[in-house]
Swiss-Prot record:
Protein known as: Glutamate-1-semialdehyde 2,1-aminomutase
Subunit structure: Homodimer.
Gene Ontology MF terms in the entry: glutamate-1-semialdehyde 2,1-aminomutase activity; pyridoxal phosphate binding; transaminase activity
Xref: InterPro entries: 4pyrrol_synth_GluAld_NH2Trfase (IPR004639), Aminotrans_3 (IPR005814), Aminotrans_3_PPA_site (IPR049704), PyrdxlP-dep_Trfase (IPR015424), PyrdxlP-dep_Trfase_major (IPR015421), PyrdxlP-dep_Trfase_small (IPR015422)
Catalytic activity: (S)-4-amino-5-oxopentanoate = 5-aminolevulinate
Predominant location: cytoplasm
Family designation: Belongs to the class-III pyridoxal-phosphate-dependent aminotransferase family. HemL subfamily.
Modified residues (N6-(pyridoxal phosphate)lysine): 271
Entry cofactors: pyridoxal 5'-phosphate
Length: 432
């Protein structure tokens, strides 16, 4: 394990003033057997820690940095915008510019509301769905992550019809989670039993899902499952909400809605839409969105919602992804890294599964294709922790969890992709 004395000292100091020394738990690297990274700066595809060590970055601020770190066009636009002021709590014209850009790209979005985090976006979308339908139950799926609002932090029951959930965090009253139904992802028959059950069928306000899950590893919804959900929501009078905080503008220009021939009623965005700044959004059909205050009776607000600095970064981010050949080049780089690894795994029949959606992917240490949370939990986390440390010591940073997505950016250098590929293949050859 490489020595990082300055990181160690700073982390010790952080622990005195911040719980666990981090402001989001996954950053602690708790299951990786080492202290977390402490970053000094970054550029393009490279992180530099406070000890001066460099790392090729496959986290990319958890998918937000599709253009890489410190993209010059985004930085220049943000610097010019900051000269006008940083925050007003009053409307600015750039909010409309970014809104128009999203509406132009996403067919299902007719109006949009900006917020500051993915949690705010999903939380507000659910409140809006309940207000629109005048129903109370929400359906989510095991392993899908929609932020940390109380009604999302739910554990499923032990059987298909045991839908009385329990909270997955302390501090959440039991009554809060009673109206969240947590069902198996990609399981049509299990969902059908609930959707047609007399206790729930006419009480479901919305179904929310990640069309391509990214927080239990990269796991796409099947086309059949997605079409089933759209059919059932229409029949029940419920809304279908896509959580595209991760997949939006990542897997394709139109996000997952480029991949599935299904149009949701509401979509949640984050990460790329903020260009590396704290911004997120939710949008959908005009008749639904017009229920938001001040037009309607569904309340949603935020002091920093539509912050002009974040809007500028987001606008530049979305303009960059529309350049000719952007996604073709992004996917070429991803394939350059992954294809030889996939071929070697297949040739040797190793118990490893790489699941990919465009430029996001997960390397699962398990034999069979992963379709849901139950499959994902079969992956060998001990091997993954060893894998993480081995790559880290060679200057390669991947998300510190078996059940997270990796990301390629437009800024990744081919030489760094080849370096990473070689390190991965060496580890696999030595351990399988």
């Amino acid at each position: 394990m490489i020595s990082r004395p300055i990181s160690q000292q700073i982390y010790s100091n952080l622990n005195r003033v911040i719980p666990g020394g981090v402001n989001s738990p996954v950053r602690a690297c708790a299951n990786m057997g080492q202290i977390p990274m402490i970053i000094d700066h970054a550029y393009r595809d490279t992180l530099v820690d406070v000890d001066g060590k460099t790392y090729v970055d496959y986290c990319g601020s958890w998918g937000a940095l599709i253009h890489g770190h410190a993209h010059p066009s985004i930085l220049e636009a943000v610097q010019q915008r900051m000269k006008k002021g940083t925050s007003f709590g009053i409307t600015t014209s750039i909010e409309g510019e970014l809104a128009q850009e999203v509406i132009k790209l996403i067919d299902s979005v007719e109006k949009i509301r900006f917020v500051s985090s993915g949690t705010e976006a999903t939380m507000s979308a659910v409140r809006l769905a309940r207000g629109y339908t005048n129903k109370e139950f929400i359906v989510k799926f095991n392993g899908n992550y929609h932020g940390h609002a109380d009604f999302f932090l739910v554990q499923a029951g032990s059987g298909v019809l045991e839908v009385s959930p329990s909270a997955s965090s302390a501090g959440i009253p039991a009554d809060i989670v009673k109206q969240t139904l947590c069902l198996p992802y990609n399981d049509i028959e299990a969902c059908r039993q609930i959707f047609h059950h007399s206790d729930y069928r006419h009480k479901i306000a919305a179904i929310i899902l990640e069309p391509i899950a990214g927080n239990m590893g990269v796991i796409p919804a099947s086309q059949e499952f997605m079409q089933f959900l759209r059919k059932e929501t229409l029949a029940m009078g419920a809304l279908l909400i896509f959580d595209e905080v991760m997949t939006g503008f990542r897997v394709a220009l139109k996000g997952a809605q480029d991949i599935y021939p299904v149009e949701p009623d509401l979509t949640c965005f984050g990460k790329i839409i903020g260009g590396g700044f704290p911004a997120a959004a939710f949008g959908g059909r005009e008749e639904i969105m017009n229920l938001l205050a001040p037009l309607g009776s569904v309340y949603q607000a935020g002091t920093l919602s539509g912050n002009p600095i974040a809007m500028e970064a987001g606008l530049q981010s979305l303009r960059l992804i529309q350049q000719p050949g952007f996604y073709e080049e992004l996917h070429r780089k991803t394939d350059l890294l992954l294809n030889p690894i996939k071929e070697t795994i297949k040739k040797n029949n190793w118990p490893i599964c790489i699941q990919q959606a465009g430029s996001m992917f997960t390397l699962f240490f398990c034999k069979n294709r992963v379709r849901n949370l139950e499959d994902a939990l079969k992956a060998n986390t001990t091997i993954f922790a060893n894998f993480f440390r081995k790559l880290f010591d060679q200057g390669i940073y991947i998300p510190p969890s078996q059940h997270e997505a990796w990301f390629i950016s437009q800024a990744h250098e081919e030489s760094n992709l080849i370096k990473t590929q070689s390190a991965i293949l060496t580890f696999l050859e030595e351990n399988f």
